[in-house]
Design a protein with these regions (language model features):
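A Zn2+-metalloprotease active-site environment signal
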Residues: 1-175, 183-186, 190-206, 212-215, ...
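Primarily a LysM-type cell-wall glycan-binding module
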Residues: 340-371, 375
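Surface-exposed amphipathic alpha-helical segments
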Residues: 34, 168, 221, 308-345
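Short hydrophobic beta-strand segments that form the core of ligand-binding sensory/regulatory domains
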Residues: 18, 305-309
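K/E-rich alpha-helical interaction surfaces of small helical-bundle regulatory domains
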Residues: 214-228, 301, 329, 333-336, ...
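Short, surface-exposed polybasic-and-hydrophobic patches located at secondary-structure transitions
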Residues: 231-243, 346-355
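Signature of long, low-cysteine stretches enriched in small and polar/charged residues
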Residues: 240-242, 256-306
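Extracytoplasmic/periplasm-facing segments of secreted or lipoprotein envelope proteins
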Residues: 199-215, 280-283, 343-346, 350, ...
Length: 375
């Protein structure tokens, strides 16, 4: 299981099959889980990765398995390592073949192959929501690669492969196990987990690293594998936070010069507050907008350096966001007792719906800040 909120599943050569916890959160029965896994097993047994990729690519993919099992957290990182096709899909014909094999495996194993059709509706709704959200947030959508996401529910070919699988049923009663599966989801992390850090409004919390930082209000924040990145609402401002572990304590200015290799520091000054010492200066550097004057801020806590950088796109006004970036850096602090709940990720709680249960009422009670009802 990949610790990612994205809704996806994929197979690697050698029979390694992965499903994200984000996918688990939207399934409603053991049979639906079997449908997703059956589809991915179909890719393995049909050797789609071998048929589509070169021997060199396949070798690289197999080599990533160790990396995957020892620290890869998200589907986006895996995409960069193993290639787009494995995570995003193999094309219409291969996806349909994986569905055919998956439905047959389900029936032979005692699961109702019709659950594959149930998954289609779930994932189509999820894909529509994800595309809408990605457009509003100015990013690429993360969607499941299978035929579930590319075919409408009444697609004749998919209906045919599921129908053909029914002949392999092992008995009159097929396993679905809705209640048992849903009960097992109680307490599952939903969205970001505290092990990777949690975004609440414009503030980022990280429980295990014991810190919080408020980014400029209105900026879009993205928690990546090795850094936290924020972009101004207009897309013309950039800020990021990284950390580096040191062998010994250093002065922040010395760290900039010796470890970051920054030369030509301008407008340098010390920063103190919240139990931290630091240093800030301007130096030319690479940004998403090209080479620009970059605000560098280093905060030292014991033998850990917290590195904050920021820049603006406009060459005529390169310091447009400078005050906001510095003000944001000054909010960096250790977690306080009142931060405990905010620093913990959300978890699924299973309730039994009644005649009067409404999505809007549940959404009002949920701790989700955005898109509560849609999710």
């Amino acid at each position: 299981i990949v610790d990612s909120p994205n809704v996806n599943a994929f197979a690697l050569p050698g029979g390694y099959i992965y499903i994200t916890r984000g996918m688990l959160a939207y399934l409603n029965s053991e049979a639906e889980l079997a449908a997703v896994l059956g589809h991915e097993i179909g890719h393995v047994t049909a050797r789609h990765s071998v048929r589509q990729h070169s021997a060199e690519t396949t070798t690289n993919v197999i080599g990533t398995v160790v990396s995957v099992t020892t620290g890869i957290q998200g589907v986006d990182e895996l995409t960069g390592m193993v290639g787009t096709a494995i995570v995003r899909g193999y094309g219409r014909e291969h996806e349909l073949e994986a569905d055919r094999l998956g439905a047959e495996y389900m029936a032979r194993s005692g699961y109702d192959p019709d659950a594959m059709l149930e998954v289609i509706g779930i994932l189509k709704d999820q894909e529509s929501f994800e595309k809408k959200r990605a457009k509003e947030e100015g990013r690429e959508p993360n969607v499941y690669h299978g035929l579930f996401s590319t075919h409408p529910e009444n697609d004749a070919r998919l209906q045919e492969v599921v129908g053909a699988a029914r002949q392999h049923k092992t008995g009159a009663s097929m396993r679905i196990n809705r209640d048992g599966f849903i009960s097992a989801l109680e307490g599952l992390h939903f969205g970001e987990s505290e092990s990777e850090g949690v975004i609440r409004g414009n503030r980022f919390y990280h429980e295990s690293l014991d810190f919080t930082l408020a980014f400029p209000t209105g900026w879009q924040i993205e928690n990546r594998d090795d850094r936290v990145v924020a972009m101004a609402a207009a897309g013309d401002g950039f800020m990021q936070l990284k950390k580096m572990k040191l062998d010994k304590r250093m002065h922040a200015r010395s760290f900039m010069q010796e470890e970051l290799k920054l030369g030509g520091l301008q407008h340098g000054e010390q920063i103190r507050g919240n139990g931290l010492t630091g240093y800030t200066a301007i130096a030319s550097g690479k940004t998403p907008f090209g080479t620009r004057p970059v605000r560098h801020i280093v905060l030292m806590r014991d033998t850990t350096a917290w590195i904050i950088t920021g820049a603006a796109a406009d060459r005529r006004d390169p310091y447009r966001y400078d005050r906001q970036i510095i003000a944001s850096a000054r909010t960096f602090r250790a977690l306080a007792s009142q931060d405990g709940q905010k620093a913990r990720g959300n978890r699924l709680h299973i309730i039994r719906a009644g005649d009067g249960t409404r999505y809007r009422d549940l959404a009002a009670q949920a701790p989700l800040e955005r898109y509560a009802e849609e999710q």
